[in-house]
Amino acid sequence: MKDTYRHQGKRQQLVKTVKKKGITDEKVLGAIGNIPRHLFMDSSFEDHAYQDKAFPIAADQTISQPYTVAFQSELLEIKKGEKVLEVGTGSGYQTAVLCLLGAKVYSIERQRELYKKTKSFLSKLGYRPKYLSFGDGYKGIPEYAPYDKIIVTAGAPEVPRDLLSQLKVGGRLVIPVGTDVQTMTLFIRKSAKEFDKNEFGAFRFVPLLEDKN
């Protein structure tokens, strides 16, 4: 697992790319510039790891486009020490970004193969989420709720009610909503029953899988 000067140079180019696309949060840009994305991908994609593109990983999932990771992270407005629920651990790349932003990360993954692989991999790289769970993302992780922030890294036709209920008052939930194409949506909890909703452009995500059993 090598991270060379060449990789680091390509990462700085990637930072410039996402900056040009409108990302301004210096902490988020710092995380993108710091995390060895090529190590989160199949070695056959290594040469392309710092292109601003999504790539396939195990279990028919993808590692999100860096701009998308940065965009969602910026919308969350994470402060150090906040409890963040991540729905869809995936490759662990977004998890690593959240860890570097100082969040206490609680992450859930539906695909067992991916969950096992990513769990051992993150600790090898030195990223320490508070809790990684295998289970149904639609249900969140209620035993550690409420959360300051919630990020969903797969598309859902609508926001799962269980996730809204696990958000603190004043908290922010970022989720791509839609079926074929998703609209990035930010919910801010104003009170026990009231949420503000803001929409930010079209994105494409793999679907959030629900456990039908």
Swiss-Prot record:
Residues at the active site: 64
Top-rank EC class of the record's enzyme: transferase
GO cellular component entries: cytoplasm
Cross-referenced InterPro entries: PCMT (IPR000682), SAM-dependent_MTases_sf (IPR029063)
GO biological process entries: methylation; protein modification process; protein repair
Compartments in which it is found: Cytoplasm
Function: Catalyzes the methyl esterification of L-isoaspartyl residues in peptides and proteins that result from spontaneous decomposition of normal L-aspartyl and L-asparaginyl residues. It plays a role in the repair and/or degradation of damaged proteins.
Keywords recorded for this protein, A-Z: Cytoplasm, Methyltransferase, S-adenosyl-L-methionine, Transferase
Name by which UniProt lists this protein: Protein-L-isoaspartate O-methyltransferase
HAMAP family assigned to the protein according to its UniProt record, in alphabetical order: PIMT
Superkingdom, natural source: Bacteria
